[in-house]
Structure formats: C-alpha cells, structure tokens
Amino acid sequence: MRVTAPRTLLLLLSGGLALTETWAGSHSLRYFDTAVSRPGRREPRFISVGYVDDTQFVRFDSDAASPRGEPRAPWVEQEGPEYWDRETQKYKRQAQADRVSLRNLRGYYNQSEDGSHTLQWMYGCDLGPDGRLLRGYGQSAYDGKDYIALNEDLRSWTAADTAAQITQRKWEAAREAEQLRAYLEGKRVESCRRYLENGKETLQRTECPKTHMTHHPVSDHEATLRCWALAFYPAEITLTWQRDGEDQIQDTELVETRPAGDGTFQKWAAVVVPSGQEQRYTCHVQHEGLPEPLTLRWKPTSQPTIPIVGIVAGLAVLAVLAVLGAVVTAMMCRRKSSGGKGGSCSQAACSNSAQGSDESLIACKA
C-alpha cells in the first residue's frame, strides 16, 4: 500500500490532539466509498461521500461529466480552489487504488471477468467534547460480505476469510497499520476539528424531537403501538418501551435512525400489546435537545358524536390552529448553539402528542 490517496474505505481516522474549545457531546467524521466493476467497460465506477455528524458535506462520482470533489453543505463551500483541487486528486488516487483491489480480489476468489463486483469501505473517527480521539474505525466489504477490518487498537487487522488473510499478510509485512495510525492521529483529527468549527452553526445546533404515538390493530386480540420521534438533531436518540415500568427490550421492534431529507432525523420503536392493555405501556424518549426524557402513553380517541357539518367546521379550525402551533413549536424547539449541551425546548413544546482536506490518505491495495 502506498501512502497517497485516501484509499478505499478502510482508513479511519483517529488522533489525540486537543481542541482549543469544548463542544457539546461527541462528534464523528465518516467516509463511505463504493467501487463497482462493470463488465465490458474499462474502469469501475467509484463514488465517495463524507459525513460530519451524519450530515453529508462532500461527494465524488467518477461517472460525473467532470469528476471533482463536490460540496454538499454550505459551510464547506467556503473552502478555496486549492482545497478542492487536493480533494479531487485524493479521490482520483483512491479510485485507482480500488480498481487495482477489485482486480486482485477477483483473483483471490477465483472469479471470472464476466460478473460485476463491489468493494465498499467505511472509515472514520469519533472525537470527544474536548476534541480528543475517542475511537477510530474502518472496515471493508466485498460483494456485500465482510472482508477486512482495522481493530480497535489501530495496530492490527481482522480478516473475515482466507482470501482476506492474503491482504492481511501483505499489510502486516508493509507495516500498514502503523502508517495508518500515524496518519490518522494527525491529519484526520485536524480535518474533523476544522469542519466542526466551520460548520458549527449547523453541526452544533440542537432540534428536539417531535413525538407522537400510533395504534395499529393486528388482530382481535393484539395491537401494535408505534412510538415516533421526528425532526430531531443531532441523530443520537433513545426510544425505550416499558410495561408497568419494566423495559421491554426483547419485545421491541426498533428501526435505525434515518435521515428525514431536510437535515434532521427520524426514528420509531414498536411493541405488540394485548388489546385492552395499551395503558400498561409507555414509551420513553431521550435526546440531547430535551431538558428531561419524554414519556408517552396511548390515549384512545373517543367516538364522534357531533354532526358531520360540525366535524368539517371543526377540522377547518384545527387545521389553522395546527399551522400556528407548528410555527410556535418550531420556534421553541429550534436552537442553534455554538457549544452548550441540552436544548432550550420544553417537554410540552417538543411533544406533538402524548399519544481539512487530506493531502493524502493511504491508498492501500488489497
């Protein structure tokens, strides 16, 4: 492996440098790279995206009309032409390293040139509130299966199979882990620090979750209660179901936190309960933007007893009130800060319903 381009996703960052200021909570810098071989075409397609705290800030696509590193967040647009030139060259070197790796891997697995194959890398680091390294990580996959990963000590590798052991022996002989560790403890942490400072108005803000609960009959005897948390930032959140005060971890269906498409995140957790026993279950929501955890309990709606005309008129009034309420809630819940931990939003406001450019990375080849 050569110390040049940021190579495919196994590089992770790390570092032990202190920041000159303190940030709320931990922060992360992650890159996701994908190289896909295409039979009949000379070069595989290479795509790389970078995230700071789960917010995409950069992208590169080798199939673009003019392949270059492209900004995906306003705060990174302030970087000058030299930065983007270095980024573009970095991605091109990385793409070339992945092309070589794809060819090598095809040989390791005794595969023909007829099929399409995929090499993926994920690498990154987490920094603490003081800007020091909490952990570094990196892992790769070939055709959707684990291949090789850097261990937590940042000094050794774990191979998933005998083919990956070939790569492991190559990298151990070349002392790649040592080079990688030294690189990560320097430039990667510096880059993360700079991104957090430049994007602090966005990256260090807090938006508390909008929550509600839904009820879905499964049969005559059971129903699903689903606890929703929407429009929150940062992405870290905890949803917990309890029955009579006891956690229902084994019986909870929990989806991964996912982007909402507007810079915020959403998540839900569900539990199947016996019909008529819904009141025994509560959902507990914890998030940095909340002054204290929220507790939600299902409240069944009463049957309508007013005339249909009254219903229509009432809905019209409620629609107006809902718009006004949403504006007020948004004003109360949205907080942009440059450091303080914890939100300024109240439980009532937040609950909708109680129901550094890298001059080089390590372009290692498998």
Swiss-Prot record:
Keywords: Disulfide bond, Glycoprotein, Immunity, Membrane, MHC I, Phosphoprotein, Signal, Transmembrane, Transmembrane helix. Residues 333-366 are cytoplasmic. SMART domains: IGc1 (SM00407). Glycans are attached at residue 110. CDD domains: IgC1_MHC_I_alpha3 (cd07698). GO terms for molecular function: peptide antigen binding; signaling receptor binding. Its main location: membrane. Residues 299-308 are annotated as: Connecting peptide. GO terms for biological process: antigen processing and presentation of endogenous peptide antigen via MHC class I via ER pathway, TAP-independent; antigen processing and presentation of endogenous peptide antigen via MHC class Ib; immune response; positive regulation of T cell mediated cytotoxicity. Pfam families: C1-set, MHC_I, MHC_I_C. Residues 115-206 are annotated as: Alpha-2. Residues 25-114 are annotated as: Alpha-1. Belongs to the MHC class I family. Heterodimer of an alpha chain and a beta chain (beta-2-microglobulin). Involved in the presentation of foreign antigens to the immune system. This is Patr class I histocompatibility antigen, C alpha chain. It comes from Pan troglodytes (Chimpanzee).
